[in-house]
Amino acid sequence: MSFPRRPKVTKSDIVDQISLNIRNNNLKLEKKYIRLVIDAFFEELKSNLCSNNVIEFRSFGTFEVRKRKGRLNARNPQTGEYVKVLDHHVAYFRPGKDLKERVWGIKG
């Protein structure tokens, strides 16, 4: 079963959309500054996750680091060989109520 390809939105697309939104509100901010803010935002997000902080954006969601247990029965898909996976940490996102409700209504 194959799924149809979904459109991909890049950081440049987001910068363009934010720039348009700002202009529609009669404000002026160059795209290079919008890009700097986005880059700084993601650096802060990564820095806080690496410090094991929980990052909460009300109604949007929560980012946190969770520990994933290791296992012995993992399989290398290229060789078929069984490998041991050690305990490790992963970034986790838990969507907020508003985001869940909005995504729930997506068609397709």
Swiss-Prot record:
Q: Which SMART domains match?
A: BHL
Question: Which CDD domains does the entry mention?
Answer: IHF_B
One Gene Ontology MF term: structural constituent of chromatin
**Can you tell which superkingdom this protein's organism belongs to?**
Bacteria
Signal peptide location:
none
Pfam families in UniProt? Bac_DNA_binding
Q: What processes in GO biological process is this protein linked to?
A: chromosome condensation
InterPro entries (UniProt xref): Hist_DNA-bd, Histone-like_DNA-bd_CS, IHF-like_DNA-bd_dom_sf
Q: What keywords were assigned to this record?
A: DNA condensation, DNA-binding
Q: Name one GO cellular component term.
A: cytosol
Q: What, per the annotation, is the impact of changing H89N?
A: In strain: UO1
Family per UniProt?
Belongs to the bacterial histone-like protein family.
Function text: Histone-like DNA-binding protein which is capable of wrapping DNA to stabilize it, and thus to prevent its denaturation under extreme environmental conditions.
Question: Which PANTHER family does this entry report, sorted A to Z?
Answer: DNA-BINDING PROTEIN HU, DNA-BINDING PROTEIN HU-BETA
Q: What is this protein called?
A: DNA-binding protein HBbu
What taxonomic classification does the UniProt entry list for its organism? Bacteria, Pseudomonadati, Spirochaetota, Spirochaetia, Spirochaetales
